[in-house]
């Protein structure tokens, strides 16, 4: 190989590397418009699924490109509690603590979180609206949601009815609805909708957030990833942002708990789903089941 050919090869390699790097940056920014807080690993998995070998980038190189261009995410956490379990309404036992779902529409989980809305007239400069989410425990698909100005049970009921509309026609299998013991979920109206649709209520038995960890986790994903860095000045803005976020989450975001499928894909499956993280809870449930035989 001549010196000229050698340098030409290096120039071509460098040009190609820079071109792919810019391609990755544009891709990451495009996805982040829909999911502002999505992490590097999930971004890389979406990238790998969408593009051919010609644009292939390894995970470590992908992370390095994000880092070099200031596209890493700084995490924000923590929301105040929206649960008031100090009431005299009937509550129900935890029916899911020893169950690993093996099909869609076996267990639904629900929780409520808050989202800030800027308000110059408010004492603190902002007010809150509230988001109810109902998610399938097997597929991780968000089936129902509602953005509301208050914590009244009527708003959570609308999220529940949205989820119920997704059930297949003639559905008759056992379905459990699991939540905390908040007044919304314990209200007579909410329980009646469950009963009218042959859905069995299940509730946490203590104030331990781990008892409803799955629902609290999806709320964190919506707030700290899908809506990351966004500010809102109206309830309508929050509604539109959540609507787009839920659509992206269900149809495009791969999930480590469902073998890197999207929730929409997993909702069409059955059988035990491979996790890409270790679940001590599931280990304990399986061990208990074996000892009972």
For the regions a protein language model found, what residue spans apply to each?
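Mobile genetic element proteins and their domesticated derivatives, centered on retroelements
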Residues: 6, 28, 43, 62, ...
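Mobile-element integrase/transposase regions
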Residues: 56-133, 158-162, 166-167, 172-174, ...
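Basic, flexible linker segments flanking DNA-binding modules
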Residues: 3-104, 208, 264-273
